[in-house]
Amino acid sequence: MIKLNEDFWNNKYKDNKTGWDLGAVSPPIKAYFDQLENKELKILIPGGGNSYEAEYLFKNGFKNVFVVDLSIIALENIKTRIPEFPDSQLLHANFFDIEERFDLIIEQTFFCAINPNLRPKYASKIHSVLKSKGKLVGLLFDAKLNEDHPPFGGNKKEYLSYFEPYFLIHNMEPCYNSYHNRQGKELFVMLQKK
């Protein structure tokens, strides 16, 4: 297994090898954002990369949006696109080291980018940084993908084994409005902290 450290991710951005990056908000996540009414929600996007999700939220009046990423280049890309985005909300850190608490966490290609051995720890960490009744919402791949490098795939049964101890499963179903090249390969998830 390759080391999925800061150098690995910075090199992906330097070499423009960001095949996971849609260059826009994923349609299912945009649809979810568009129905949110509480602009005061404290939102985290872990492993957010270029985070078009953060940009969309910020430009639509959500000012409590945080992005955490190992890659300083990805965070600089966000700042270049949105100069008014607060520096204090661009967290150059390892997600597993953060301690702040959030109302909502958005999952968009982070879970599939971490070493699969860290998945139980991911579920536990998400639970610990969510406020009472907080939610994890986003997309998980529902497909067998790579075994030695990201993106790593999985399936609903596997994911339930990680999340059921910590969350009420409001939704974990095939996504009907995925981006065209991800059709039939994604689950839309909405989990609420127990």
Locate each region found by the language model:
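Class I (Rossmann-like) S-adenosyl-L-methionine-dependent methyltransferase catalytic domain
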Residues: 1-45, 49-100, 114-194
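Short catalytic micro-motifs in class I SAM-dependent methyltransferases
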Residues: 109, 113
